[in-house]
Amino acid sequence: MNTRSGDAEGDIRGKMIAPVRDGNGGQKRKLVQSNDIQRDEDGGAKRRIIQSSDQKNGKILRGIHGCVSPRCSAPTYQSRFSWYEQDIWTYITRFLDGKSLVKLGATNKWFYKIAMEDTVWRFACLRDLQVPETFPVSSTWIKIYASAFDGSHSYLFHQKEKHIDWMRLGAFVLDSRTSFLTESLSGRLKVPTEGTIEQMLQSSGSCLINDIKSGIWIADLQLLRCPLCDLSTCDGTMQTLDVRHIELFLSEGYKDGSWDYNLIGSHKLEKDASAACGAIFDLKHLKKSSSSGILNLKSWTGEADDSQPKAVIAPHAVAVHTRLQQNEGILVKYHTMKAGTDGDIVSIRISQQLL
């Protein structure tokens, strides 16, 4: 029977001819599989088929395959994250100062909306003034922040010709509507209970004033020229502890000059004064403020030969102290400003001038 060469080639494809010996020592050829060859006991070659237990049980063993899960790409990340998350940027603004907030608002309309939020500026104002609480205000907090940190002081609006220099002391809170003013920080504070303001000053060098506008107050220390003469050759100076309600500079009555300072009392010490002092306390928190270290002069007034003005501020009080050279005495004046004729007191000044 004839077969085609292709069929014959298919039958022997994958096989090899291996020589084996017969019983007479001759050789004969045997076809065996080329993929697995081993010798039997007679020295002949035979095929060994290896199967797994799963194959024997009819199971198909799956091979190793590549990962087919979707891979993340850069566009995928960008599509899932939005740079314009209001909560994130509102939180970021808590760490920005006023200038940085203005720059952020100038970026585009979306950031402008975030940066102009009143709560953002309220937080920035309380943080930078270092006061723990706030009170109801009539102005926006961005305007309040600007008036507090734009370098303005009370003598920038009025009496510019008398002004020499100034120093920002900080901010504190007056919330009891009654303040205790004193020019003496030595010894224990004594609160007068009777008499007019002038009588209180003459007897103890301190007084009580009522109808204080509650809220945050800003304190500055001002250095002025002699108020008694207009001579350019006069070297006399006057020190003033100048405190104001945080919204004073935004009030129309102050800006147009209709609100003015009134002298409420004065006290003259006609002997050598070692220092010029002035302090303002919230009466309700007087005991707490006294124990905060204000009366411990050694802790904040410097060395005995240090004549530079020193100041200390507490949550509900402020005080200044300047050592003086030998002198003939000192004149202390107390001024207040009201918000209109019958309004609350919105500013207080304690001034010291050598006689």
From Swiss-Prot:
Comp. bias (Basic and acidic residues): 1-14
Signal peptide: none
Domain of life: Eukaryota
Domain F-box as annotated: residue spans: 78-124
Region (Disordered): 1-44
PANTHER family per the UniProt record, alphabetical: F-BOX PROTEIN RMF (PTHR47149:SF1)
Name the record gives this protein: Probable F-box protein At5g36000
Origin species: Arabidopsis thaliana
